[in-house]
């Protein structure tokens, strides 16, 4: 499974929301993510991909869409 598919599966598992058709939609505005959900997502992404996501890099506008989350995880996995 590639990073994109894995990230989408994690989002679907955590929030029971298939975001594959709304990759560029703001997940906060869509009601998928909120502050608690963001914490859950960070913890799950860090655990699943064995990465550390600096909180300073997980700003709402920096990781607010599925595409941005996938890009951020990909960058951290390749660092």
UniProtKB/Swiss-Prot annotation:
Domain called Carrier: residue spans: 1-77
Family matches, as InterPro entries: ACP-like_sf, DltC, PP-bd_ACP
CC annotations in GO: cytoplasm
Keyword list, A-Z: Cell wall biogenesis/degradation, Cytoplasm, Phosphopantetheine, Phosphoprotein
GO biological process, one term: cell wall organization
PTM-bearing positions, type O-(pantetheine 4'-phosphoryl)serine: 35
GO MF annotations in UniProt: D-alanyl carrier activity
Post-translational modification, as annotated: 4'-phosphopantetheine is transferred from CoA to a specific serine of apo-DCP.
Pathway it works in: Cell wall biogenesis; lipoteichoic acid biosynthesis
PROSITE patterns named among the record's database cross-references: CARRIER
Source domain of life: Bacteria
Entries under Pfam families matching the protein: PP-binding (PF00550)
Location within or outside the cell: Cytoplasm
Recorded family membership: Belongs to the DltC family.
Matches recorded under NCBIfam families: dltC, PRK05087.1
Free-text function comment from the UniProt entry: Carrier protein involved in the D-alanylation of lipoteichoic acid (LTA). The loading of thioester-linked D-alanine onto DltC is catalyzed by D-alanine--D-alanyl carrier protein ligase DltA. The DltC-carried D-alanyl group is further transferred to cell membrane phosphatidylglycerol (PG) by forming an ester bond, probably catalyzed by DltD. D-alanylation of LTA plays an important role in modulating the properties of the cell wall in Gram-positive bacteria, influencing the net charge of the cell wall.
Listed name of the protein: D-alanyl carrier protein
Lineage: Bacteria, Bacillati, Bacillota, Bacilli, Lactobacillales
């Amino acid at each position: 499974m590639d990073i994109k598919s894995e990230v989408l599966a994690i989002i679907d598992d955590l929030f029971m929301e298939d975001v594959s058709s709304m990759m560029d939609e703001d997940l906060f505005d869509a009601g998928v993510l909120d502050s608690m959900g963001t914490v859950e997502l960070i913890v799950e992404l860090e655990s699943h991909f064995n990465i550390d996501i600096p909180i300073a890099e997980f700003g709402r506008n920096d990781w607010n869409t599925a595409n941005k989350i996938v890009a951020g995880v990909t960058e951290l996995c390749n660092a």
